Amino acid sequence: MRLLYKRITVRIARPTHSNFLSRESYMRRWHFVVAGFVLAFGAGLTAQNKAESRDMALLAHNDLQARSAYMPTIHRQGDRYIAYVGHHGGQMMNPLTGRMEPNGTSILDVTNPRSPRYLFHIPGDAGQGEGGGAQMAAVCSGATLPKADRTKVYLLRSFGGSAHEIWDVTTPEKPSRVTVVVSGLRDTHKSFWECDTGIGYLVSGDPAWRAERMTKIYDLSNPASPVFIRDYGVFGQQPGSTGPVPTDLHGPISLGPKGNRVYFAHGTGRAGIVQIVDREKLLNGPKEPTEANLRYPVIAQIDLPPESGAHTALPLLGMPMPEFAKQRPPANHPQPGMGHEHGDTIPRLTTGAHRDFLAVVGETTGNECLENRQFVRMVDITWDTNPIGVESWNVPEASGNFCERGGRFGAHASHENTTPIYYGRLLFVTFFNAGLRVVDVRDPYDLKEVAYYIPATTDKTDQRCVGQANAPDRRCKVAIQSNNVEVDDRGYIYIADRANTGLHIVELTGAARRIANFPGQSTAQR
């Protein structure tokens, strides 16, 4: 299903921006009602008891101690692959310790993706939902961080909504806390950590700021000694400002010093904003949060329609465009001046037959379709001062009667790992009760789904409700809620479930796998 995205407003930043019945009749009527209830609602309650898939296969499942899972991160540590999974608030029994523990961070050895081993659970904040747990997890090796112990591996995580902290996870079975980077916050979320520089963009709720979430930037090159760099947000969020408050930040993605861009996604499910920011100016420009200083590093701002959000903004740079290979602009025709120098895993923008794009994914937040639908949107940022929307994509609701299944239905998040196996070829996007969807992005102007995997519910899967507690019209259904997704450098795919179902490890099969760029796969296979 393709819905052309035509409404994007772009602002260019400027440096200086019944009757009574017999008993028998009554019972017959009651039996009919009960039977009707089962027919009407039973399917919705059990629709996902079996997995549904196309060109994807389940390798393994771990229930993550039935904790509501948010974010999986997979890191290679020597000859092992370790998964770190951040959790939403709540508490569950930890069989490894025999104690009830607040949801925090699950650590698993996924070296053998068909037999993951649960190693440790680091408890998080005791709060519920978004206010507890430890949703975010980012991992860097000391060998890449400029001032760290080269023998160590470090985990940056949120602690509920109040703090960000760093842990030593060199031995993942025995993690230890290194330091608290910042505390006293009123919210946190999905931060970004540059492993080659140590710069951390920490999604935070500073009590002095008007927005629930903005960015605190730290130099974490020496994880034991964080150095504060600056606070940053959209103009109108800062202390002392007036007027409507721009929507909260969800999370940034940085290209690091070589790419010199940071993409900030705001708004999740409404009033979305995407900022394209000059990294060098952000880090080294004037830091007092005045209007001029907040506008200074902004290259462009994309204001989405009020019903649309921006959860993830993933750059897809240097995309080959064979359709344009024969185009020959005049010698004096302006050329894109982004100045990107892409890393080894990102192809360079070399000719007119290559263009740069941003995959923007909104987040669905209401159960049973009681809100606006969120999409995957493709924005052409070849001229990043003049971004333009070129395509939108969505899962057709009728393909699975998803509005009737319970829980959320709609987009949430994409993977972020830029492994060349998938980069510029396939985009993995979670759609809650529609599971994981795989989109062929080789032609950003014509997105196509090529695979999907909807996990089966289990006895651990929690219900999702509509209506107020104790209200007569309140209804609840058990439903898969595929929350976030990530891939590792081997091409395995990890799906975290929000409704306590756990972690699913899957792989591509069939025609979809042939689109990927697996080592040793011939061009003919692709």
Where are these regions (language model features)?
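Feature marking well-ordered beta-strand scaffolds used for ligand recognition
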Residues: L45-R526
